[in-house]
Design a protein with these regions (language model features):
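N-terminal Rossmann-like FAD-binding beta1-loop-alpha1 element of flavoenzymes
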Residues: 4-29
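Dinucleotide-binding Rossmann-like beta1-alpha1 core, especially the glycine-rich loop
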Residues: 44-136
Length: 250
């Protein structure tokens, strides 16, 4: 079946990121999006990893375009305070280490120095051995060098709600944007959604994408696809299902 038109259900960050990707990469496909005016958007001040830069590269999206408008900041690594010992920290580094003789130089440098001077090159110095940006972060600075590889050495802290709205307003002008509540569907002979209903309005598309988050209007609600938990008590591998957010000294 040739996909000629797509309906995205849900207008949060995931919905508008999906719409942006379709507009950019599949301009021959007619993209539509329907969202509820009454359903709040999930957003807790998202923290990303460096892999998000691959997505931005697909969209030809530059930091100068969106960061200021969305209240975003750069993120250079993840620090675990009191992680393995009270008063000690461990940093999870971002970026690509320098390659020497087909080996990641940052890793090898740290292990060699750790053996030679274990009292100085402790575990909390690992990130700074991987990449120069660790040194900058400890000095509370970030380079202004135009050639610095921000595309893989950094990630972002962002207001996800504002980011989704920015994509909507700046990258999705071609999207047919609607408001409404999905109330039902008609399925085809294979059990797939053929037609959606938004109250009394009929919506028929070649492909439907569920971006409704935890509510899962299409997958769980209409298709009855069971939610698969990663919690260890339910056969998964996730030991922790709770997070406490707080400000650390910085």
């Amino acid at each position: 079946m040739q996909i000629r038109n797509v309906l995205i259900v849900g207008g949060g960050t995931a919905g508008w990121m999906t719409a942006t990707a379709l507009v950019k990469l599949c301009p021959h496909i007619k993209t539509s999006l329907i969202e509820s005016k009454d359903q709040p958007i999930i957003g807790v001040g998202e923290s990303t990893l460096g892999q998000i830069n691959d997505f931005f590269a697909l969209l030809d999206l530059t930091d100068e375009e969106w960061m200021k408008e969305t209240g975003s900041t750069y993120k250079s690594n993840i620090r675990f305070t009191d992680f393995y010992k009270k008063g000690e920290t461990w940093d999870y580094p971002f970026g690509k280490s320098t390659i020497v003789n087909d080996l990641p130089h940052g890793w090898m440098s740290w292990f060699a120095l750790n053996i030679e001077k274990p009292e100085k090159f402790t575990r909390d110095t690992f990130a700074r051995s991987m990449n120069i940006i660790g040194h900058l972060a400890y000095a509370n600075k970030l380079t202004r060098c135009d050639k610095f590889p921000f595309d893989h050495d950094t990630a972002y802290h962002m207001d996800a709600v504002k980011f989704g709205q920015w994509l909507r307003d700046n990258r999705c002008q071609e999207v047919d944007h609607m408001y409404g509540e999905i109330t039902g569907c008609v399925k085809d002979e294979h059990g797939n959604i053929d037609v959606l209903y938004a109250r009394n309005k009929e919506l028929k598309y070649d492909l439907y994408i569920d971006c409704t988050g935890f509510i899962s209007v299409l997958l769980e609600g209409l298709m009855k696809v069971p939610f698969k938990s990663f919690h260890v008590n339910e056969g998964g591998c996730l030991l922790n299902d709770t997070a406490v957010t707080c400000h650390m000294p910085h």
